[in-house]
Amino acid sequence: KAGKMGGAYCYGVTPNVTPYVMLNFTGEARDIATMAHELGHAVHAMMAEQHNVFTFHSTLPLAETASVFGERILSDALMASESSKSVKQSLLVNQLDDIYATVMRQAYFVSFERTAHDMVAQGATTNDLANTYMTLLKQQFGKSLRVPQEFQWEWLTIPHLYASPFYCYAY
């Protein structure tokens, strides 16, 4: 459907219930990687079914390790089945981008989030937060690229920052 929002999650209810995976498939290749990520969570939940309801759900870092592992399995399978050098190069660039986003970008999100909480407690405005975010973006990318000014508002597009405080630390 045109205009459909992307998004996905996996919900492991209890040890004896097959996990639910929700994925809004928009027809983009990225959706396949998202599915691999969520299926990583699902497989992890299924492998934990011998646990009781109190120990079934893992900590966020462990859960995200399983989901990123799902992405790596997909990447390995795509690389092994592809013969075109240019497609393989594209796959490698996407893998590097994903690895950077999974590790470094998440660390910068957490850094911003910690600073933002302190700033809000001191009465900071959204403009103050945007300026701080932009400073961290420029620090993150250094001289490797010029960060357009409108990216100061990117933090508002990251639901984890305001809907699930400190979720990004798990990566």
Regions inferred by a protein language model and the residue ranges of each:
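Cation-handling catalytic/transport regions enriched in His/Asp/Glu
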Residues: K1-Y171
